[in-house]
Amino acid sequence: FLMDLATEIGRLKRRAAAKGLKAAVRLNGTSDLPYERYKVPGTDKNIMELFPDVQFYDYTKLDNRFINKKLPANYHLTFSRAEDNDHKLKKVLKHTSAAVVFAGKLPKTWRGYPVINGDEHDARFTDAGPGVIIGLIAKGKARHDKSGFVINQKEA
């Protein structure tokens, strides 16, 4: 898989360069795999190290990927706050930004941290941070969430 991924990223990089752009890749669409740990077969490098001029980014619920870990310079991780990892948020915000889902309108600040509109784009590596809340408006089934995943305005 990693060899195929490297081939595809190489193609993307060439297409982006032909248009005068820098390639950006989000590795985890629905998973939370620590790609920084996986070496591409036949190399001693992970995928980010193999493509130092490509920007990689992901969301993760795993706080241990930030704390005392050295991530590749071209890999930006945004913490995904949920009801079961909320207690880790303050510590994580010292290292990165955090995505938080809100019911209704986004607040200007939350728990003393500035909130920016994360629904405008997904290029989290362009955000100011650490210590910034990436506010997302609850959509679909999340609008009816009662688990604590979605922050209600009374809590904001």
Identify what each model region corresponds to.
Residues 1-156:
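Class I S-adenosyl-L-methionine
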